[in-house]
């Protein structure tokens, strides 16, 4: 639950430093910069950098735009790693453990290996493997990320299922031959979310 988690991290920062800001707007703007920042890597405008670097660049820009000043470098770096400390949805850990009883379960995220490992350790997420865009030096939806995970698992594409809350991610995986499952997160982007409220018809399973 990235949105609630990051907003809470911002509020904790305000409590500790006295620096005030529109933290809901900052969080939403930060997420809005997510895909555009990765696209510059994907289209060759810049060399590979991991998501922590992209997140920090976006954060610095947004802080200036919102006129939020006075953060020390230490506070800035701590806020930037809020993405390492996200809290899971209430059904996540139980659901992963149920899946793990019958299947091998892995991440396939644009987050870095360090980010995913920190999150797993903090929240007791029982991954068998941690696959990241950093593993393949490609951000989703590049084919190298999806197919790279399939290769690492020593599987055929039809033997691997991507489970996600985002139709665009699932449709990309589907286009490369993976099975797909949609999990609804109706408030991921806030109470007024108006997309990713149901699976597209092409998705194999809707949970």
What name fits each language-model region?
Residues 19, 102-104, 178:
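A generic structural motif
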Residues 97, 111-207:
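Asp-based, Mg2+/Mn2+-dependent phosphohydrolase catalytic module
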Residues 15-23, 65-71, 123-126, 154:
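Short helix-capping segments at alpha-helix termini
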Residues 1-32:
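Active-site neighborhood of HAD-like aspartate-dependent phosphohydrolases
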Residues 4, 53-57, 144, 171:
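A structural signal for well-ordered alpha-helical segments within the folded catalytic domains
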Residues 5-12, 29, 57-61, 78, ...:
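Alpha-helical elements of Rossmann-like donor-binding domains used by nucleotide-donor carbohydrate transfer enzymes
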Residues 24, 29-77:
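A metal-dependent, Asp-based hydrolase signature
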Residues 73-122, 130-133:
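Substrate-recognition element of Asp-dependent hydrolases with the DxDx(T/V) motif
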């Amino acid at each position: 639950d990235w949105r609630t988690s990051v907003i809470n991290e911002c509020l904790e920062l305000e409590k500790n430093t006295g620096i005030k800001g529109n933290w809901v707007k900052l969080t939403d703007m930060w997420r809005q910069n997510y895909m555009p920042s990765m696209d510059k890597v994907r289209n060759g405008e810049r060399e590979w950098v991991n998501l922590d670097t992209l997140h920090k660049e976006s954060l610095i820009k947004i802080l200036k735009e919102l006129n939020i000043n006075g953060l020390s470098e230490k506070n800035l770096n701590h806020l930037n790693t809020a993405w390492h400390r996200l809290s899971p949805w209430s059904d996540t850990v139980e659901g992963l453990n149920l899946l793990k009883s019958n299947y091998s379960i892995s991440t396939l995220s644009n987050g870095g290996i360090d980010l995913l490992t920190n999150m797993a350790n903090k929240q007791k997420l029982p991954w068998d493997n941690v696959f990241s865009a950093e593993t393949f030096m490609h951000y989703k939806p590049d084919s190298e990320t999806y197919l790279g995970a399939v290769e690492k698992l020593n599987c055929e594409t039809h033997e691997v299922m991507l489970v996600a809350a985002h139709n665009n991610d699932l449709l990309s995986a589907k286009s490369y031959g993976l099975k797909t499952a949609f999990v609804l997160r109706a408030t991921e982007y806030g109470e007024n979310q108006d997309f990713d409220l149901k699976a597209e018809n092409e998705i194999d399973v809707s949970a």
